[in-house]
């Protein structure tokens, strides 16, 4: 039945219909474990990201193909998946590198990340925390329990939260840590993927020693409006 849904989803006329069917069919009320290219994932169909993976058999193809190409250029010592969600990047790249650290602060996402690693019998090191510029506690916020991939670390300067009815915003207390205090290596070739919903600069501020003391390739998912501040910070610190 999955192959039928994948086939239908390729046609524009079915792009919106098929995900709706998945949400409503009793068959898809619970999670399902599906086989992808070289790994398995347990997917939850109330999540739009999980439905996309189920229907396309892949996720963020352009970004991950570009990232994969970097592993083919030279030997990489370590991959850091910051903002791992339920682990797609880490699982996909495991056949390229087995030394992977995955970071995910949201407790529900983290449980799913751990489950996906377990069903593949992969040895990926996980951290249930957000990367930050200090060690301690903070909180994340989100507005929909079915869209936890968009969880954001709370920042009083982040205007995005003002777009929502404060009464409907959900908060969760989390641990935060500086990458510099978690990973102490030098002269290594490291690829870092960062997808942290406007928290990018804070992550980089807590990883400045790691960046300066190693050969780093960064792939950051970022809004156009935030590109300059990130690039300026990296240039100022010799990246």
Give, region by region, the residue ranges found by the protein language model:
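Phosphate/nucleotide-binding beta-alpha loop and adjacent structural elements of enzyme active sites
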Residues: 1-239
